[in-house]
Amino acid sequence: MAAVITLIGATASGKTDLACALYQRFPLRLISVDSAQIYRGMDIGTAKPSAAFLKQYPHDLIDCCEPEEHYSAARFCQDAHQAIAKAHADGKIPLLVGGTMLYYHALFSGLSDLPPADAQLRAEIMAEMHTRGLPALYADLLAYDPEQANKIAANDTQRIIRFTELFRQTGQPPSALFAQQKQAAPTWNSLHLALLPERHLLHQAIAQRFQTMMAAGFLEEVARLKMRPKLTAEHSSMRSVGYRQLWRHLDGEIDLETAVELSIIATRQLAKRQITWLNNRLKTVLSMHFYDPYQAETPNRVFQQVAQFCKHNEGTFL
């Protein structure tokens, strides 16, 4: 059975550094699992590795599409399966690294047999949102699918639009579609590594990293993106943390200090959601080994575990 390793963790938990250290020691191929780093032109605010860094440590599934495009979990699964197959064909073990928990869940537990995104219908729904307002679309969702509506925030634009799209495509409530989920039996021998840092240390790292991003030109990056004629604040890419707050600043809604403060708060909230996924939904799908990334002995412990896994799987992926 072919081998796969995952390195999962919240934002700013040190996944990339550890993944690269593993890459130097073992026959691995790095595959990004990040719903923001897939977009071209979104570099600073996503903490995307530099071109020079990627030349030394190549990653699949970075810079896959334009920020105006819709990139779904279904598309990720398709792209990830191709990247994993290529790694195995090259005699490498794929190391999936990133913090988009939905992508991991979809890849290892399967997706509902949902219709693909419909660009024309989505454009119509977004136009309707601008005329009727997001609260009206959420009220509709509450009416035809209260179960799914109560699982999300009333201002969750991305999911409200997607659920509206699914309902209009199929005539069925999204919760009913998700209940029909087809489980895909894992086809890999997998090792799942999870980084779970102390909360206060993670919060410090998030704040420090965001200030570093600002000093590196994050605001200017958002300004360049804002000049793209077809890109709006409602696109999934621009709903990413940091981008939506700085976009609001550039629109004159909030001052820069407030935008930075809100961005750091939103990033901490994202990390909390990621950790909740790790401790709940993903634990029901994956058998994970947890490590504190801020403990000095963690890298060596991870190296030992990966070495044992590689030795056990020697020859099975060639």
UniProtKB/Swiss-Prot annotation:
Which residues does the record give as ATP binding sites?
A: G9, A10, T11, A12, S13, G14, K15, T16
Q: Which UniProt keywords apply?
A: ATP-binding, Magnesium, Nucleotide-binding, Transferase, tRNA processing
**Which catalytic reaction applies to this protein?**
adenosine(37) in tRNA + dimethylallyl diphosphate = N(6)-dimethylallyladenosine(37) in tRNA + diphosphate
NCBIfam families named among the record's database cross-references: miaA
* Quaternary data: Monomer.
Under the heading Pfam families, the entry gives: IPPT (PF01715)
* Name used for this protein in its record: tRNA dimethylallyltransferase
* List of residues binding substrate: T11, A12, S13, G14, K15, T16
The source organism is Dichelobacter nodosus (strain VCS1703A)
Q: What is its EC number?
A: 2.5.1.75
